């Protein structure tokens, strides 16, 4: 993501317990992803924890981050900005940092002053923030002109685009106006329990005598009394946010402070009251969000319950070929609900249900024997308002959901908001961004797929409307949200608000690629996702079965402490986009099949006894596994139910573990994790999980 090829870069010893490394990044870069290799080979399996990332504004030239073993990187000095207005204290803080001087170590030796409206004030170097600083009291309405005098030379603020001539010299400037407004707030439901969400919205009424029109620059709500952040962001464009409460939040009335900041730094405050009530389950089959056990299937590869729809997307799209439809459908899921219930799962994640592009086309990205454009997986939508006819009818979809609900099971539908399918440019012409413009993770066509301009309010509203309709009209329980990192936070907050208004118990788990409990692009705890898929977990499981027990236990302990029902991750071992756990051991680490099977059983034990939402990939429970070897993708195999026998050790292992988890769901969903005894050398790990004791 730095804009350069992935390379192994060595650290330089900096004395004491400090090591440093310099990573080049191209000007458009806003994020650097990396992992810490534990040896010089660069083997991706031999690393300290999972993937890590540092995110920063695009105007920054130098980022200084620090990281301790077992934790995530943190920005170690403030971003380079020229000034900050504190309207409450009626003062301005001026800052100066020469990035080149910082890099070569001469910054603190400079002499710097700030010239404000023609008067110079000496600035003092602050070693903690790595910059020169000066605080000036007093704010007046209108423009304030300023520039810096660095080692005798005048320079304008490189991080402020506002500059003009003032007294025949070049100056930067900012504007300030004291505005007057009243903020009020209201909550969707006066009361809710820990398994529900709620929507809070605010309204700003400005004094008509103000010289300028107020614009909301930022807003936040203090939900610390609900177990959350003391400054949870509220998207200014929405002026509404979804909130939730942790399971240990005490019952009763909670007062939530809201702060709104305008474009000049003026702050306005209000509060809203909510009541936390007791959670009463409807019956023995009812379960909480953090008690979900998910079974993820590629619907097309699971079971063919209605052969008449197999060629509904075109006669050439169905066949015995990894790039074609294989016949799995809604009717097939319904037919196997008893199998899934007997296994011990309570939530079924199915791949996207909407109509996808039809036909087959071999392109440069495909191969002659594996057609590329048969959209059996569901991620290439052509119409977000219709069901994919190859998966079944509206009636079959409704039957699948109702039959699952009769068994106390819930349906999680995979949705795509980021993009449409290949060749749909004319269909969505007024909703797409310019393909020729590529700006980071969000404003780019990923893999050539038509990318929605979700930052456009009209585009966002239409996409949210389409997705909300599925859960509102058919009783879908949860969404699995594709490509979270490629869509702006405002859109995710809007979708969360919309679904919460329809069903306060509705939840969303996001696919923020590379996310873990400590690094998720601020998609958790911010009114966006209720959970993210945990991309760190299978790396940790691989490390665990390789003998690194103590380091993995440290990771699991930290993860256990961080997670709660409002901030969850879903641990998986295999998926449709990654190598299967067992196959990866055989292919990458050269395990025999028996060795890989034994290791996979250990990994499954780790997964199903850990805090978080277990996500079982279809077929994994009977020993199936494959590689993400595009275009063949043997990890997208056809489910083989003949392997689900009493003699199948893997199958019985999963059933036994799930039976235990379901019997003590509060312990596994919310309990503490304590290591009783473990040894890397002797290869054992004894852990205590407890709750309420």
Model-assigned labels for residue ranges:
Residues 1-29, 38-56, 93-141, 149-175, ...:
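Aromatic-rich carbohydrate-binding modules that target alpha-glucans
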Residues 30-34, 142-146, 252-256:
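Exposed beta-strand face motif in extracellular beta-rich ectodomains
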Residues 70-106, 168-179, 289:
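Basic K/R-rich, polyanion-interacting modules in nucleoproteins and related proteins
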Residues 83-88, 190-197:
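Short, solvent-exposed loop/linker segments at the N-terminal edge
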Residues 105-112, 465-572, 588, 596-597, ...:
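Active-site-proximal helices and loops of the catalytic beta/alpha 8
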Residues 270-277:
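C-terminal edge beta-strand
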